[in-house]
A protein has these predicted regions:
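Catalytic cores and adjacent flexible loops of soluble metabolic enzymes
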Residues: 1-274
Length: 274
């Protein structure tokens, strides 16, 4: 059965009450995991490519996020350890598994003491081998996104984890927001299966334009985990609204993901997509 991750990302806007409502809504929708990001603004580093950004043929290839502007924005979204523990308690209350993305080596020790079920590595850290090694030494489950990563880097990460005898999941990911279906490259899922038994997808397609089509197609390619950004706010009230599903869309995804493969294929044949 395919597992669903509701990614709160920055959609909680640093508001504990909003975060609480989001966890409750995600649980009601039937997800398996709810995820936050343990990002701290003071851990940010200046990266020249984010100062400029890159847009080609009206598609955002590199998000423009200048350091100072991003620092001032993220500072309002910082989650203290107390707030992260509150998030975990909410997940336990609503019977979903708490999960977080870890960005910094110096945060691993303190986060490992909290009752997160799973740690995630963001796409741009798939080749951060020291971070990977240290996370592998924890007892948390490990999921790694692979967007924008070279095959040699994916292979190196897999080899490190296998040497450490750490089970892990790779998520196929296209770091274009939103991801056009023609850019989805789902064959990559088959490639990732060569490195680990469990693979999935971090779906950044547009819910308004494409519904759950990309996530469901990924299941046909063998995805066992689907991650989607989630919001309960209007799309224009959150930075990630364009790639975030709302409650009804998330609930539909959970329901559709439980269909058998034959039913999913029939759904695509009606749309002449499979």
């Amino acid at each position: 059965m395919t597992k669903i991750i509701a990614e709160l990302c920055q959609n909680h806007n640093g508001d504990k009450n909003l975060m609480s409502d989001m966890v409750a809504a995600a649980a009601e929708a039937g997800v398996d995991y709810v995820k936050i990001q343990s990002m701290q603004s003071k851990d940010l580093t200046k990266r020249p490519r984010f100062e400029r950004g890159l847009i080609e043929s009206d598609i955002t290839k590199v998000i423009k996020r200048p350091f100072r502007t991003e620092y001032n924005r993220l500072r309002k979204l910082d989650l203290s350890l107390e707030n992260q523990n509150y998030f975990i308690e909410l997940c336990i209350k609503y019977k979903v598994k708490p999960m977080t993305t870890v960005f910094s080596l110096n945060r691993i020790k303190e986060l490992d003491k909290l009752n997160f079920d799973t740690f995630k590595v963001a796409s741009f850290d798939c080749s951060s081998y020291k971070l990977i090694e240290q996370l592998a030494k924890t007892k948390k489950n490990l999921i790694i996104s692979t967007g924008g990563t070279y095959l040699r880097e994916i292979k190196e990460t897999a080899e490190i984890l296998k040497k450490l005898k750490k089970k892990f999941t790779f998520l196929h990911c296209i770091s274009i927001y939103p991801t056009p279906l023609k850019e989805a490259n789902l064959n990559r899922i088959e490639l990732l299966k060569k490195f680990t038994k469990t693979v999935g997808i971090s779906d950044h397609s547009s819910p308004e334009k494409n519904g759950n089509d990309l996530s469901l197609a990924a299941i046909l390619y063998g995805a066992k985990i689907i991650e989607r950004h989630f919001t309960i706010l209007k799309k224009d009230k959150t930075r990630d609204g364009v790639v975030s599903v709302n409650f009804n869309q998330l609930k539909t995804l959970v329901s559709q993901s439980k269909e058998n493969i034959i039913s999913i294929k029939k759904r695509f044949k009606k749309k002449k997509m499979y």
